[in-house]
């Protein structure tokens, strides 16, 4: 034990001395700032003394100018917003932007200094007049104004209630440690700056209250405003909040002073103070003393990193007690700000460590003070909900649950992935939870006390100094009695899946011989529990299992063996984690029917049932029951059937599918989906169609998961069976051969970008009577002047055509949909409202032209385009050539107004001029209007979730 502790003491003393000696090793920054309330500007005079603490001579310096990230459409911030389908900054007017206007840059001899901006426009490169030697300083004077943006893009800027939130608003030095670390503002809260001592002299309007994370040395009023002096020693950027009302309160606790505007309306103010005392006591016990004068814990900071989940529901259905919710909000925001303010990690590349410590301590807080807290809170006690497996989950079970939700979709990323390379879901939730869960997993393996002490040691020794993840790693390894290389190599630095199973169990009188299988080859420790009457009677850890390993344990009246019973390990699949020792029949999983949907229960075969109601004009309203096995976590094998009843046809209809999804890798060829689907509905009065389609689909994606580029290749064999009402007129098909089959190959390449969208679709179809190929290209461009241009090109050609009708022909304005792919509300209608439904496919025309040219049995070539006039009002135009066998090709065209309310989801097309002449002046104009509408719930859901994934 002595040999273990002694090195830690020595290293601790050395680090303490290092921190004492490095107090003076920092930059010096003095700011004189005036807030101009009328112009929403900051007038700044900055005196910066840059210390070259490297071993290299510097001829240039770099400063972060993140306030300039709002200056135009081409900044790194604007491009990041576009990747998330946000175009508010792109569409902003000039007076709605924020920027930095640098007036002068001079040295201490008052000589002008040359400077330039980076390509991202939020980093400034300063060319020194003379080289800066190691351990020497250079003084720079900068005069500039900062135009603040409205806070509709991010919380930064001003609100329409005359409130201001300023963070990362002035020039700060970039970090140089032998190389420059230059990071643009991408709204990731990860400014990387050097250790600085800052003095701020501030003048602001008399009608505002000011709050800051800096220490306020003095505040006084004068006839036209207020003046304050603030100080930040070894601080990062100064955060300022101005409000017309004083909404912040100060809580002086034994361990730190907190300024906060987070409140709970139904929780007494005295009790709130006691809760803050409890939170700060917990933080002090686990981290140690906070080194700054006060900690700012604001609602704005909380909103940037909230408690995701049910607490975001409207207040009238909040499921948690006010005390619990208040403490968790204070705890999460305080931990986030403490670690951000005091640990000088590289926040873009090493953010996972801050996330790990914060979320690990949040898990520990709930375990200590709220061990019985359920994930659904009070909702878990309500009849009709309490029977769900989700209602039985503890609050801390959300961490593996959320992480696995992303891992099951093949979207998890290594913890060391830079912030700006994470998809939004991982950046906001997934990787944060995985990081905290990882430390909790490690604590369960090596002992909670050792992880707790390592965190506290790391924080105390390295606060307010430059630090790396490797420093934390070395402290952990010295504390552990076991080898923990696996934690960093196979958990932190990897996205490999953890998945074990109990392969078999052999019983003897006094022992159990158990064979464990590592299904994915990720070598990490696995826990095994012995249960009797749902009570734990034994627990073991097994490590270094590369493929399979047989272990022997003593019998201790176990009835069941369960791997990872406490779910400390984020294991991919827990459905095969248990073995019953009671015989063959006792090991069979029972079937469990559950309403709607639920979390995964590994001890049952789950079937979910949900009432469904669909509509088309032939079946009318069709109520039914959907039966499926899709849990809240995605599963590889899914079954989904929806039998329904058509009241109009007085017959059963419905659909069903069997699907197996195999993820092959993270990038490149990343999935293969094998599927069999079928369905039956009516497509006219007393006329039914049935489909049976086996298919396989492959997907490709680039190494950059943030990219919206995807490629797909699918093969399917569509079999159509039709029963026709002989009393109805010809439905544009060969009534003597109502059944047909089509072999279809499709290749798609998509770049789903809000500024530059493009897609390419190649299609090949082979049937007994025809062979055809087609190509479709679509492009959308949002220009810098906010003008949007849309272009779609389509070309199709029959290689062989022995049909005697237009049922399989290329359509100019309304495809027949013989493969039953499209969501027509009335697919056989030739007149009436339902016939006006528009689906942009094949020719893509909007006007109904002469019947002779509405279909092509030879070849077709069309172009569809539109350009916006104002917001969602656009002009569209279509032109094309239609060629039928035995006839000359025909030039066709139309034009009109497009009301692009929600692209691809709800649009209206008002025709103006076409081959028919001026349609707007012709009778029955209302019958010529076309519309796009999406009523499918799954498709609509994609509109709101696309930015996350």
Regions found by a protein language model. Give the residues of each.
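Extended, low-hydrophobicity, Ser/Thr/Pro/Gly-biased non-transmembrane segments
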Residues: 85-104, 110, 116-117, 122, ...
């Amino acid at each position: 034990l002595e040999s273990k502790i002694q090195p830690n003491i020595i290293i601790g003393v050395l680090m303490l001395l290092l921190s004492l000696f490095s107090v003076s090793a920092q930059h010096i920054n003095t700011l004189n700032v005036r807030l101009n309330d009328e112009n929403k500007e900051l007038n700044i005079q900055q005196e910066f003394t840059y210390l070259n603490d490297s071993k290299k001579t510097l001829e240039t310096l770099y400063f972060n100018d993140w306030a300039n990230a709002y200056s135009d459409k081409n900044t790194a911030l604007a491009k990041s917003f576009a990747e998330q389908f946000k175009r508010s900054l792109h569409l902003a007017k000039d007076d709605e932007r924020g920027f930095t206007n640098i007036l002068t840059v001079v040295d201490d001899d008052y000589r002008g200094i040359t400077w330039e901006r980076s390509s991202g426009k939020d980093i400034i490169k300063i060319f020194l007049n003379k080289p800066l030697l190691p351990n020497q300083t250079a003084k720079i004077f900068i005069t500039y104004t900062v135009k603040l943006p409205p806070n509709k893009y991010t919380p930064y800027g001003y609100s329409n209630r005359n409130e201001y939130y300023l963070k990362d608003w002035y020039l700060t030095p970039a970090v140089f440690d032998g190389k420059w670390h230059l990071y643009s503002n991408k709204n990731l809260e990860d400014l990387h700056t050097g250790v600085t001592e800052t003095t701020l002299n501030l003048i602001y309007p008399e009608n505002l209250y000011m709050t800051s994370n800096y220490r306020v040395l003095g505040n006084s009023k004068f006839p036209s405003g207020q003046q304050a002096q603030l100080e930040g020693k070894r601080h990062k950027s100064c955060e300022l909040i101005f409000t017309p009302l004083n909404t912040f309160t100060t809580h002086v606790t034994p361990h730190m002073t907190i300024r906060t505007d987070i409140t709970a309306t139904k929780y007494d103010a005295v009790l709130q103070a006691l809760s803050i005392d409890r939170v700060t006591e917990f933080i002090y016990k686990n981290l140690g003393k906070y080194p700054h004068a006060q900690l700012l814990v604001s609602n704005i900071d909380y909103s940037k990193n909230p408690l995701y989940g049910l607490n975001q529901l409207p207040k009238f259905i909040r499921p948690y007690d006010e005390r619990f919710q208040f403490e968790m909000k204070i705890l999460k925001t305080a931990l986030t700000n403490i670690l951000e303010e005091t640990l000088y990690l590289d926040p873009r590349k090493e953010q996972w460590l801050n996330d790990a410590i914060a979320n690990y301590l949040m898990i520990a807080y709930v375990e200590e003070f709220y061990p019985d807290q359920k994930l659904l809170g009070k909702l878990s006690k309500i009849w009709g909900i309490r029977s769900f497996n989700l209602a039985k989950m503890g609050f801390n079970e959300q961490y593996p649950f959320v992480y696995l939700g992303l891992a099951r979709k093949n979207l998890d990323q290594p913890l060391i992935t830079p912030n700006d390379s994470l998809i939004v879901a991982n950046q906001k939730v997934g990787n944060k939870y995985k990081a905290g869960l990882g430390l909790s997993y490690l604590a369960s393996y090596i002992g909670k006390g050792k992880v707790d002490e390592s965190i506290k040691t790391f924080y105390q020794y390295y606060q307010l100094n430059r630090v790396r993840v490797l420093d934390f790693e070395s402290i952990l390894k010295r504390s552990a009695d076991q080898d923990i290389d696996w934690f960093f190599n196979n958990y932190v630095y990897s996205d490999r899946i953890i998945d074990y199973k109990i392969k078999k169990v052999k019983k003897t009188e006094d022992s159990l011989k158990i064979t464990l299988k590592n299904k994915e080859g990720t070598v990490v420790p696995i826990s095994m529990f012995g249960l009797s009457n749902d009570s734990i009677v034994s627990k073991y850890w097994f490590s270094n299992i590369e493929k399979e390993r047989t272990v022997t344990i003593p019998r201790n009246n176990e009835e069941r063996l369960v791997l990872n019973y406490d779910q400390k390990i984020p294991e991919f699949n827990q459905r095969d984690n248990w073995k019953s020792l009671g015989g063959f029949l006792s090991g069979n999983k029972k079937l469990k029917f559950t309403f709607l949907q639920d979390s995964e229960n590994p001890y049952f075969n789950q079937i979910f049932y949900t009432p469904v109601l669909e509509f088309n004009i032939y079946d009318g309203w069709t109520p039914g029951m959907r039966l499926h096995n899709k849990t809240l976590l995605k599963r590889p094998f899914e079954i989904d059937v929806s039998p329904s009843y058509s009241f109009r046809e007085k017959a059963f209809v419905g659909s069903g599918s069997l699907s197996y999804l195999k993820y092959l890798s993270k990038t490149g060829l990343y999935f293969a989906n094998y599927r069999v689907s079928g369905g039956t509905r009516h497509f006219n009065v007393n006329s039914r169609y049935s489909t049976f389609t086996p298919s396989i689909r492959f997907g490709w994606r680039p190494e950059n998961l943030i990219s919206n580029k995807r490629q797909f290749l699918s093969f399917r064999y569509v079999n159509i069976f039709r029963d026709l009402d002989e009393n109805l007129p010809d439905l544009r098909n060969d009534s003597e051969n109502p059944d047909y089959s089509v072999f279809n190959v499709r290749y798609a390449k998509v770049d789903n970008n809000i500024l530059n969208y493009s897609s390419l679709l190649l299609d090949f179809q082979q049937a007994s009577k025809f062979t055809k190929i087609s190509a479709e290209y679509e492009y959308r461009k949002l220009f810098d002047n906010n003008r949007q241009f849309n272009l779609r090109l389509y070309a199709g050609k029959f290689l062989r055509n022995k049909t005697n009708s237009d049922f399989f022909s290329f359509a100019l304005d309304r495809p027949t949909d013989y493969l039953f792919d499209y969501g027509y509300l009335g697919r056989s209608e030739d007149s009436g409202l339902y016939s006006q439904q528009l689906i942009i496919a094949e020719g893509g025309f909007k006007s109904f032209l002469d019947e002779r040219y509405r279909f092509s049995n030879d070849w077709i070539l069309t172009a569809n385009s539109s350009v916006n006039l104002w917001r969602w009002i656009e002009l569209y135009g279509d032109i094309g050539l239609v060629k039928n066998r035995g006839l000359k090709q025909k030039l066709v065209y139309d034009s009109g107004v497009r009301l692009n309310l929600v692209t691809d989801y709800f649009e209206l097309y008002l025709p103006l001029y076409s081959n028919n002449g001026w349609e707007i002046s012709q009778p029955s104009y209302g019958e010529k209007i076309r519309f796009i509408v999406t009523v499918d719930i799954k498709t609509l859901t994609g509109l709101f979730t696309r930015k996350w994934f």
